[in-house]
UniProtKB/Swiss-Prot annotation:
Pfam families: MJ1316
InterPro entries: MJ1316 (IPR040459), UPF0248 (IPR007547)
Protein family membership: Belongs to the UPF0248 family.
Protein name: UPF0248 protein TK0315
Top-rank lineage group of the source organism: Archaea
Length: 81
């Protein structure tokens, strides 16, 4: 499941022509959201160096908890403590 950094996984989804970015979303830690988590479709994400961007919002990669395919399969998940 966890192969490489979350940025590498997202780059593969976004730039590999065999993948469809609309088939994936990320789950981030979000203090204001119900349950403390928020889903963001990968197609709305722009990748940066230490952060990714959703519109004007700059979000650090360490806030990503999971990358999930729309069929429910977890592609990448943060390490459990």
């Amino acid at each position: 499941m966890r192969k490489g950094s979350v940025k590498e996984v997202l780059a593969k989804i976004k730039y590999d022509p065999r993948e469809k970015e609309e088939d994936y979303y990320v789950v981030i830690e979000h203090r204001g959201a119900y349950g403390g988590e928020k889903k963001i479709p990968v197609e709305l994400i722009e990748l940066g160096h230490g952060y990714f961007f959703v519109g004007e919002a700059q979000i650090p990669y360490h806030r990503i908890l999971r990358v999930v395919r729309k069929d429910g399969k977890v592609i990448w998940e943060t390490k459990k403590l």
